[in-house]
């Protein structure tokens, strides 16, 4: 369809309201300009996978500043957040059509900084949660089972690298168990152990050096009997 537009200029620069309409008369865009820069409230009707109404504000310097929203045509929010001097700042939340929260992010000066949580669409079950600093994972990281919401993975990051303990649930056709590894600056280094979920008995133990198994390793049955003992070199 044909898009009709209305633009205003002053001294060769866009100034005042800029409007665009679809051929059926639907307002597609209402932007405000001052001396060639976008200022104040900017409204856009976005057509895509979802049709959305987007509203963003610009300051006198022509930078995004203040609340941001994109809203489904039926009125529920898709994304809510805010800008400060052209950069994302504070909490940003993404929603599903159903109204369920899909993602929560925290920003500081345009970089992800703080808690990040994602949820499964439909069930609302927490999928992942972790902390960011300067756009990199930093601190506790967790993943959950989408069926029952239980923890299935846990680790610690430092400046975007695994650093410290990592726990992983291994689902087996016999007995499920937790593996606990140790990381230093992104490499597996130090003690490793696996414990049965059912009774917390030791299943396996040994050591890693630079991502490889080294030294004496042992494996046990669920009732605590030594099943196997071997050396890794």
List the model feature ranges, each with a label.
Residues 1-233:
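Glycine/tyrosine- and acidic-biased, solvent-exposed loop/turn segments at the edges of beta-strands
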